[in-house]
Regions:
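WD40 beta-propeller blade core
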Residues: 47-48, 89, 139-140, 177
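Anionic-ligand binding region
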Residues: 84-112, 117
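Short coil turn/linker residues within repeat-based beta-strand modules
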Residues: 1, 53-55, 85, 95, ...
């Protein structure tokens, strides 16, 4: 499948001129196809840059929201991590880009019986499944928020994942791994698509 090269984050920051408090604490940036973007800070605050108005706005977030983010392929949902928790938070997105209705939705597995391992980055595929870098490996969640598979690695916890086309690349313990999948990545800068429902089962 064809791969769209992601926008340069440094170019975006220089062009959009975020508030100083945001620029100095950026954790995750989700560039969108129209030049807008969601940006999280290390404290879990979420900001939205509107490419039409050139305005930065701080978004509503629930208590204890974390800095990791991913956007659903239809661009109608934004998912974030939750601090010291195995939950992920799902927000609805209004047409103007603002967030509302935040609630716990995805739940990750954890064999350590504590929540001291921070959730890593995450990305969706075109089927609406969410891939999350965790201490146990890459946890794959379905549309209903349930973990359906865990890809574990011999080197242990996953530090970061990269999903490009039909290949997933994994950084773990100073080593890099790759695996070809029977699905395709959908990153934030890709055009939104309709996703077939997996049902309630």
């Amino acid at each position: 499948p064809s791969v769209i090269v992601p926008p340069s984050i440094s170019d975006f920051i220089a062009r959009s001129r975020p508030p100083k408090s945001v620029k100095n604490s950026i954790h995750t940036t989700l560039p969108l196809p129209d030049g807008s973007a969601y940006v999280s800070t290390v404290d879990g605050d979420i900001w939205f840059y509107d490419s039409k108005t050139k305005i930065w706005s701080q978004m509503y977030t629930v208590e204890n929201g974390g800095p990791q983010m991913a956007i659903y392929p239809d661009h109608k949902l934004l998912v974030t991590s939750e601090k010291n928790s195995d939950w992920l938070i799902s927000y609805l997105i209004k047409p103007d880009g603002t967030l509302y209705g935040g609630q716990r939705f995805y739940w990750l597995h954890n064999t350590s019986n504590h929540s001291q391992h921070p959730t890593g980055n995450m990305v969706f595929d075109t089927d609406g499944n969410l891939y999350v870098a965790t201490y146990m490996g890459i946890q794959i969640c379905d549309q209903n928020g349930r973990v359906r598979a865990i890809l574990s690695l011999p080197s242990g916890p996953v530090d970061r994942l990269y999903f490009i086309g039909d290949q997933i690349f994994i950084e773990s313990g100073g080593r890099f791994y790759s695996r070809k999948l029977h699905t395709t990545a959908h990153n934030s800068w890709d055009e939104p698509i309709e996703v077939k429902s997996q049902g309630q089962g």
